[in-house]
Amino acid sequence: MQIIADLHTHTSVTDHAFSTLTEMVQAAEDRGLAAIAITNHGPTNPDGPHEWHFSNLDLIPRKIGKVTVIRGIEFDITAPAGGINVISNKSLKPVEFALASFHECMFPPVDSSVHTAALEAILYNPYVNAFGHLGNSNFPFDHEYIISRCNDHGKIVEINNASLSIRKDSHDNCMDIARLCMKYEVPISVDSDSHICYRVGHVEGALEMLEEIGFPEELIINSSVERLNNYFKGRGLHLFDEEDLL
């Protein structure tokens, strides 16, 4: 089991990240990745870039060196009703992949029912592609209720490698969420959530957990170039050249 793309990374325009776009892409190439998504925090996050960062994402070349670059965002799920960062449709136009995640600075934890309702609202949000780091134990929610509805709304679930080391008690949550994704055949991505170039593509802990439960590789959208290409083709995006698919 492997990944060929890292779909959750942050560059230094996010203040608590440390590497430039060039450094992140070079790290992806050094790791042998075919693609990387740059997914900085939304503009209303106290540590996020200005909205113009996102409106200018289309300045980033599709391919830098050997690596395909996906233009993304990590939305903050906002309290209390499960909104996302306020950003204009014009600024969102270049965005090709969007995660939505709980962060304590934008959504102080409450209880499972409130968190579940917020996630349910995100299911209906057309701008969001994926749920980010759902295993955070500060945000308990009804796992089965949300996961069982993801396919109906075209949402994938991220298994976040960083959660396994920095978010207390997230391992069991991540495993339960992964088992439910397997049960309901919900596609997932496996990502580093890297905030520095040295961690790009490092998802060993997440892959080990998935192998432990026998998670099917065909449900991991970033486990092959073909699967990733098919995922984005389904959303009208031509991601890879023919030579990349050989």
Task: Describe the predicted segments one by one.
Residues 41, 186-200:
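Short acidic/histidine-rich active-site segments
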Residues 3-5, 37, 71, 130, ...:
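Residue-level marker for buried hydrophobic side chains located in beta-strands
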Residues 22-36, 58-62:
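Alpha-helical scaffold segments that flank or form the walls of functional sites
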Residues 11-12, 35-41:
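Ser/Thr-glycine-rich phosphate-binding loops at phosphate-binding pockets of nucleotides
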Residues 42, 47-159, 211-220, 227-246:
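Extended substrate/RNA-proximal surfaces in nucleic-acid metabolism proteins
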